[in-house]
Amino acid sequence: MTSLQYPIGLYGPVENKTKEQLEAWIDQLAEIPQQYEAVTNQLTDAQLDTPYRTGGWTVRQLIHHVADSHLNAYLRFKLALTEETPHIRPYDQAGFAELPDSKAPISLSLPFISSLHRRWVTLLRGMTAEDFTASYYHPADQQTVSLYDATGMYVWHSTHHLAHITELIKRNQWN
């Protein structure tokens, strides 16, 4: 179950914060939308509506969740850059995944993710090293998160859900 739920392992912030690591993460955020498109472009509606694990979200819900989550992330970055350690607003991710738009075609979210990531990457590439020390406070987790750590966490998040989809495709021999 753990390998199905966390195919790339749990997230943990890096100890040694480097410019090179940050640049690699930003490059990954730039590439992720194309990877989601490539891995889902041949899936049927029945395949998109298959949960990646028992009790887990469907591929369709995962795609819409990434759109929702990364929109929130982008706004959290902007808040942290313009306010002093803002308290961000958590949201009910599981509840969002059950709303009617999570059953919509993924063709609504894939271009959105692509556009959002282009804006996000533009923001990230324009930030200074000092900007990445800005932070926000997550009240549900009771943690202050630097934008450096948040960048790594959202790269993990992107790769985590991409792995849910690619592992499901492999297990079911859909390719």
Curated annotation (Swiss-Prot):
One of its GO terms (cellular component) is cytoplasm. InterPro entries: DinB-like, DinB/YfiT-like, Put_metal_dep_hydrolase_YfiT. It is found in: Cytoplasm. Transmembrane segments: none annotated. Keywords: Cytoplasm, Hydrolase, Metal-binding, Zinc. Homodimer. Its cofactor is Zn(2+). SUPFAM superfamilies: DinB/YfiT-like putative metalloenzymes. Its EC number is 3.-.-.-. It comes from the Bacteria. Binds 1 zinc ion per subunit. Pfam families: DinB_2 (PF12867). Belongs to the metal hydrolase YfiT family. The keyword Signal does not apply. This is Putative metal-dependent hydrolase BPUM_0784. Possible metal-dependent hydrolase.
